[in-house]
Swiss-Prot record:
Name of the protein this chain belongs to: Homeobox protein Hox-B7a
Sorted UniProt keywords: Developmental protein, DNA-binding, Homeobox, Nucleus, Transcription, Transcription regulation
Species this protein is from: Danio rerio (Zebrafish)
Gene3D superfamilies in alphabetical order: Homeodomain-like
GO biological process: anterior/posterior pattern specification; regulation of transcription by RNA polymerase II
Length: 227
């Protein structure tokens, strides 16, 4: 009996206390807790259903994303130009080596081109040599030079024949005078007189009454004059 009495008394006290707390001892705290719990529940519900939390957040977030997309598109517009330039430069470098329309050149063609170039150079040098005038004083007098037959004009031959008719042997002074008068060298005058004497001897071999001693004396005099 005593235990039941104490239990009923405690139970009645607890009921009085709970009614006191529920009537308004801490009314704001219970409402705040309820509002927070309701906000959390609504937040969880929106997260589970995928609905936007608030209108302001729903407006601000897409605008931020749209700005991000515009920035990304702007950067994409900047970089492809650089990549395109790189591609163009690469194509330019590759075009230097890709020539499908050009014919293949062989070693024989190169040899022919070189030979034709050499022939053109030879022709050019020959034309230049033909255009040059070579005077007698420009010709070399060395022993290795090929000696051609000297041709005399009609006037030169006539004057030399006249001189030979009077003198078959010339002194050096007279030889120099004739060379200046006929525009010939002293050597040419000497050679002409030697050849003319040999011809005269052959023509007048039978009728010539001159002794060989006289010819020898004349030759010695000419050699002395040369010295």
């Amino acid at each position: 009996m005593s235990s039941l009495y104490y239990a009923n008394a405690l139970f009645s006290k607890y009921q009085v206390a709970s009614s006191a707390f529920s009537t308004g001892v801490f009314p704001e705290q219970t409402s705040c807790a309820f509002s927070c719990s309701s906000q959390r529940a609504s937040g969880y519900g929106s997260a589970s259903t995928g609905a936007p939390v608030s209108s302001s957040s729903s407006v601000s977030l897409p605008s931020m994303y749209t700005n991000g997309t515009s920035l990304s598109s702007h950067t994409q517009g900047m970089y492809p130009t650089a990549y395109e330039l790189g591609a163009v430069s690469l194509n330019m470098h590759s075009s230097l080596f890709d020539h499908p329309n050009l014919p293949m050149v062989s070693a024989g063609d190169l040899c022919k081109a070189q030979s034709s170039g050499k022939e053109e150079q030879r022709g050019y040098h020959q034309n230049n040599e033909n255009n040059l005038r070579i005077y007698p004083w420009m010709r070399s007098t060395g022993a290795d030079r090929k000696r051609g037959r000297q041709t005399y004009s009609r006037y030169q031959t006539l004057e030399l024949e006249k001189e030979f008719h009077f003198n078959r042997y010339l002194s050096r002074r007279r030889r120099i005078e004739i060379a200046h008068a006929l525009c010939l060298t002293e050597r040419q005058i000497k050679i002409w007189f030697q050849n003319r004497r040999m011809k005269w001897k052959k023509e007048n071999k039978s009728t010539d009454r001159c002794s060989p001693a006289a010819d020898q004396i004349g030759g010695d005099e000419e050699e002395e004059d040369d010295e």
